[in-house]
């Protein structure tokens, strides 16, 4: 399919069916588009909307975000996952405040230099917010292009990604780029979906190679399968009435900056930790274990609950706090921690 025909059909479809009233599309600014694009990485629109609205209510400008404590940013992000995005968001906002006087940069080089911003995100900000001619290549766009032009291979491989970037550059029109890029994302999200694509509703159906050969399931190529390693983590749930002991993780690494239960690889390490702090472990109780899966490994979590008689226990741990179940502080929590805290709120641990 010729590039001009491709873009014309996509734009015509967008005018009729595309999404035009998402929260970040109303009174568009580079800040709003950037925030939404970061949140939308590996996350569905319906999940992102309430988070975006809460962020905009609390941080209406990039300067507000830059001046906020990281704990508060992570707290508002809790449940959205991939917390490196939130940490990079905060760093980038501070960079905008420091280097650009709080005005969001408007050149590709400056935007791409922000933490957590790659080529596609920079292109999305420039095209969607400012109408500048930059292509994008998010997951939805990759899927549409790979199927239409039968691009084999996993897009995570550099040569496949380069082929898709070349196609994206070719089909992105000189005019109407903001509508076109939004249309491509909408097309992938609404019509050219991962499973059960609605090919009969697609404006590219007649020129799509995958549709012609009924081979959409082959494109894009899947990531080579690998068996995820398994690890075990013993979580220590120290409870004093309605207070639960949490410690802040280091700034980088797994759950960086979030508040979590003390974690150990083995139960004897957990008991040794308690003994060193003169905490009686007679009433230590194992709760139901469960699995939490990361992108690169499975973590089998074994919660170990222990009621304590004093808040003084373990408060020499630096960045630690007693989390009040009735009046939760504004701190970021890892998803398994939130799950266990909710379990403790409902009453006796099981």
Swiss-Prot record:
Database matches in SMART domains: ENDO3c, FES
Keyword Nucleus: no
Recorded catalytic activity of this chain's protein: Hydrolyzes free adenine bases from 7,8-dihydro-8-oxoguanine:adenine mismatched double-stranded DNA, leaving an apurinic site
InterPro entries: A/G_AdeGlyc_MutY (IPR005760), DNA_glycosylase (IPR011257), Endonuclease-III-like_CS2 (IPR004036), Endonuclease3_FeS-loop_motif (IPR003651), Endouclease-III_FeS-bd_BS (IPR004035), HhH-GPD_domain (IPR003265), HhH_base_excis_C (IPR023170), HhH_motif (IPR000445)
Residues given in the record as [4Fe-4S] cluster binding sites: 192, 199, 202, 208
Site (Transition state stabilizer): 138
Pfam families in alphabetical order: HHH, HhH-GPD, NUDIX_4
The UniProt record lists the keyword Ligase: no
Membership in a protein family: Belongs to the Nth/MutY family.
Gene Ontology biological process terms from the UniProt entry: base-excision repair; mismatch repair
Keywords noted in UniProt: 4Fe-4S, DNA damage, DNA repair, Glycosidase, Hydrolase, Iron, Iron-sulfur, Metal-binding
Transmembrane spans: none
Catalytic site positions: 37 (proton donor/acceptor)
Cofactor binding comment, as recorded: Binds 1 [4Fe-4S] cluster. The cluster does not appear to play a role in catalysis, but is probably involved in the proper positioning of the enzyme along the DNA strand.
EC nos: 3.2.2.31
Name this polypeptide is given: Adenine DNA glycosylase
Molecular function GO terms recorded: 4 iron, 4 sulfur cluster binding; 8-oxo-7,8-dihydroguanine DNA N-glycosylase activity; adenine/guanine mispair binding; metal ion binding; oxidized purine DNA binding; purine-specific mismatch base pair DNA N-glycosylase activity
Function: Adenine glycosylase active on G-A mispairs. MutY also corrects error-prone DNA synthesis past GO lesions which are due to the oxidatively damaged form of guanine: 7,8-dihydro-8-oxoguanine (8-oxo-dGTP).
Cofactor(s) for this UniProt protein: [4Fe-4S] cluster
Record-linked CDD domains: ENDO3c, NUDIX_DNA_Glycosylase_C-MutY
UniProt subunit comment: Monomer.
């Amino acid at each position: 399919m010729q590039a001009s025909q491709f873009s014309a059909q996509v734009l015509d479809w967008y005018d009729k069916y595309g999404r035009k009233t998402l929260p970040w599309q109303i009174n568009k600014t580079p800040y709003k588009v950037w925030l939404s694009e970061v949140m939308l990485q590996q996350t569905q629109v319906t999940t992102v909307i309430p988070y975006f609205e809460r962020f905009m209510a609390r941080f209406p400008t990039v300067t507000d975000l830059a001046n906020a404590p990281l704990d508060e940013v992570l707290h508002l992000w809790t449940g959205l996952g991939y917390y490196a995005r939130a940490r990079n968001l905060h760093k980038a906002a501070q960079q905008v405040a420091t280097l650009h006087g709080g005005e969001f940069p408007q050149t590709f080089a400056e935007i791409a230099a922000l933490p957590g911003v790659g080529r596609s995100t920079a292109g999305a900000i420039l095209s969607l917010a400012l109408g500048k001619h930059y292509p994008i290549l998010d997951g939805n766009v990759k899927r549409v292009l790979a199927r239409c032009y039968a691009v084999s291979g996993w897009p995570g491989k550099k040569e496949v990604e380069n082929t898709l970037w070349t196609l994206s550059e070719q089909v992105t029109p000189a005019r109407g780029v903001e509508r076109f890029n939004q249309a491509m994302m909408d097309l992938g999200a609404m019509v050219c979906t991962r499973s059960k694509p609605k090919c009969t509703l697609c404006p590219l159906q007649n020129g799509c190679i995958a549709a012609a050969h009924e081979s959409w399931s082959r494109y894009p190529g899947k990531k080579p399968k690998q068996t995820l390693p398994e690890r075990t983590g013993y979580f220590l749930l120290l409870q004093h009435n309605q207070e639960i002991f949490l410690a802040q993780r280091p700034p980088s690494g797994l759950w960086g900056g979030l508040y979590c239960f003390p974690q150990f690889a083995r139960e004897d390490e957990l008991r040794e930790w308690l003994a060193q702090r003169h905490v009686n472990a007679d009433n230590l109780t194992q709760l139901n274990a469960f699995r939490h899966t990361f992108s690169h490994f499975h973590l089998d979590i074994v919660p170990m609950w222990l009621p304590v008689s004093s808040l003084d226990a373990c408060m020499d741990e630096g960045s630690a706090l007693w989390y009040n179940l009735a009046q939760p502080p504004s701190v970021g929590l890892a998803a398994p921690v939130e799950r266990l805290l909710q379990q403790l709120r409902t009453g006796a641990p099981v």
